[in-house]
Amino acid sequence: MKGLKEFRRKVGDFDLFSVPDYLNSLSINPDKLPYSIRVLVENLLHSVDGFLVREEDVKNVANWKPKPEEVEIPFMPVRVVLQDFTGVPVIVDLAAMRDAMVELGGDPDRINPIVQSDLVIDHSVQVDYFGTSYAYEWNTKLELERNRERYQLLKWAQKAFNNFRVVPTGTGIIHQVNLEYLAKVAYVKDGVVVFDTLVGTDSHTTMINGLGVLGWGVGGIEAEAVMLGQPYYMLLPEVVGVKLVGELREGATATDLVLTITEVLRKKGVVGKFVEYFGPALENLSVPDRATIANMAPEYGSTCGYFPIDQRTLEYLRGTGRDEELVKLVEIFAKEQGVFWTPNSPEPEYSEVIEINLSDIEPSVAGPRRPQDRIPLKELKKAFYVSLEKDFGKKFENGSEIRHGSVVIAAITSCTNTSNPSVMIGAGLLAKKAVERGLDVKPYVKTSLAPGSRVVTDYLKMSGLLPYLEALRFHVVGYGCTTCIGNSGPLPPNVEKEIKEGDLVVSAVLSGNRNFEARVHPLVKSNFLASPILVVAFAIAGKVDIDFENEPLGYDPNGQPVYLRDIWPSQREIREYIERFLKPELFREKYARVFEGDEFWRNLEVKEGKTFEWDPNSTYIRKPPYFDNFTLDVVPPDDIKGAYVLVMAGDSVTTDHISPAGSIHPESPAGKYLIERGVKPSDFNSYGSRRGNHEVMMRGTFANVRFRNYLFEEEVRGWWTIYIPTGEKMSIYDAAMRYKENGIPLIILAGKEYGSGSSRDWAAKGTALLGVKAVIAESFERIHRSNLVGMGVLPLQFKDGQNVKSLKLTGFERYDVLGIRDIHPRKTLKVIAHKDNGERVEFEVIARLDTPVEVEYFKHGGILPYVLRKIYNGEI
């Protein structure tokens, strides 16, 4: 074991590296540091090797101040978690690296995960069937037919790579499986107890912060580097303390709390910062409540949303069937390291403190387009009418059964909420009371229940609540992300027909964490996040324009009105059900054989070998071009000259706009590519499922049907651009290929919050493969900026107060970016935009290569070439 040996101590049967002893040696009061910073100190303290982690790095973290210096630090997670949408391309890349190593004359076994890596298959199941007892079976059958090639790759990887495990499909959602089973809180490594830390290839990896485990989402490219033993590099963050006081009142849920926190913190601005929760209300928040709050850290913009280890942590570990030895180890270790929170713990120093009173939380939803746009439930009806006119230019008309505001999708989905027994039991109790009063869901509502683990189904069955959910057509449709990530499946044909013919603004209500435009379903423009309890209520109401306080949900068989308050479960009822039916044995039983899979997985045949056998006819898995013509020599980047703008984007362009995860339109470039190869539109599957095929993903870049390219004066959405040399309108992919043929570099112009949303590495990979050399934006979301660097694309930020509009840029200029040759972190570069009439617009931008290692990645053409050269040269 590495580490600063003088701080290694014996505790029982194990050793540890003492954070309090180390901090005291520097005359630093441990209690003054935020808990998350103390965890970072321990992470580096046990990782010091003088090369990847230096003693100076540990000191830099230990000397954290509320306004920290701009200093780069390494982070050495002990685990990596992956889901299959982002995990398949990671495995494809590692397989391609093995091929490249063979071509260089090296040993392919040297390309191997060093860090324990677990992949959970959860992103592929779609809701094709719903509302019946056979929905799960039929959806699973379709999933396996569509994804056989991808699953063969993953099963090959499970056998070919060390330290790599796969949780097969039909088990649960990555973050819930991590919370309920994979996470240890204290991790034994080489006889030394260390903090369980991780990165994940999904932005909601932060959910594990609710268990006191530090971790967050990174791009697939960065995850690969961590898997191969590289640190994750970051700037020492500010830590915003969120003081929680009070107690949730009757009728308010953890979902309402997290939507409020998301609203408050988004307005405050916490991008790139740690958020750490403290205060007396921690005693009243269970780990599932905390996990719900931590899950949505990407939505409020922070790197993480950390809760310290405390008595609630230990209760949850016991309640989920973890070994008593582990629970005791966690308690001893956390107390020895001075990070075990109690109500009497001293308050650390924070960069800023924001207080939130739980007593003020009221029932809420968020929407119709962004998670941070919270609407109190009592104001939703009015808010929807305002949005209808303002956002969609329509006026409400009370016409046929399906109209503006009709709920056509009601989905109990996502690890955000299905991991929380209080809201799941609550949904079951509301369903029970609704059925007992003779209520039903409206016939045009597509209902679904997609638990994040099989434990949920078991306790709903044992409690007798599942039959009531099924009576309202909330049958289990699968164990995966489903509607939350756009795998909502088709709407019934008659519903689709009415929406299209009436050009209707219909709604989805889901218990997920994201509601970006066109994410849930291309025809559903208005999407609201809500607790599972409210999802059931909206399915019964059949519309979002309802005042629940004054309008009935429906009428019983005797014509008596039934209001939401009449069937809303009390906190006492919910607690009683949890205490009776949620037992540790449930978790032990369901996770006993978690890596074995079902009969399909066990019978799935794969060819074994150190290198993967690529199928040239596959439309799912193709060998990527990243290492074509690869050499060990580094060709440093040069200035960009004469670039054209491929895309001019607006504000808040998400990675979902850049690289959609959902359905593939038959008329899109990716759709045409698949049709040319004999794939029927009914077999397209989704973009997310085809991330192992760069040909599909290149064509899918900027192909979201709601993406707007501002090179067009009129509103044009979808995959279109203008090929500037001739003025032709053509697909973004075709234009990029024509520019490439003519040797013309490309850039992208964008507004604020470019690349927000999912940690989607294909948003950067696709951009790079289209030939884009730089993206000039007003601001970048953390993960996407990092991913661009990882793919050798230069993120450039306008100086404060400047943007496309203020500089009067049209996007039709030719651009030079000067000063790249001797680039260094955050260097100011000069941009010259040449107009057709000979005029020049000159302005400065900041190169968002934030750390020295990012400069190295950029010079090598990206993180993968950098790592491959290091491995080949024996430096890793």
Located regions from the model:
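Mobile "lid/hinge" segments at catalytic clefts and subdomain interfaces of large enzymes
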Residues: 189-334, 425-431, 435-443, 475-590, ...
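N-terminal amphipathic, basic-rich helices that act as targeting or association modules
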Residues: 1-142, 285-295, 299-324, 616-659, ...
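Terminal amphipathic helices with adjacent charged low-complexity linkers/tails
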Residues: 76, 94-149, 277, 282-392, ...
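Acidic, glycine-rich flexible loop/linker segments
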Residues: 556-574, 581, 785-857, 875
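Extracellular/luminal Protease-associated
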Residues: 274, 278-285, 513, 736-780
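Long, structured ligand/cofactor-binding scaffold of large enzymes
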Residues: 49-244, 256-259, 363-366, 380-381, ...
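NTP/phosphate- and nucleic-acid-binding module
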Residues: 681-694, 698-729, 737-741, 796, ...
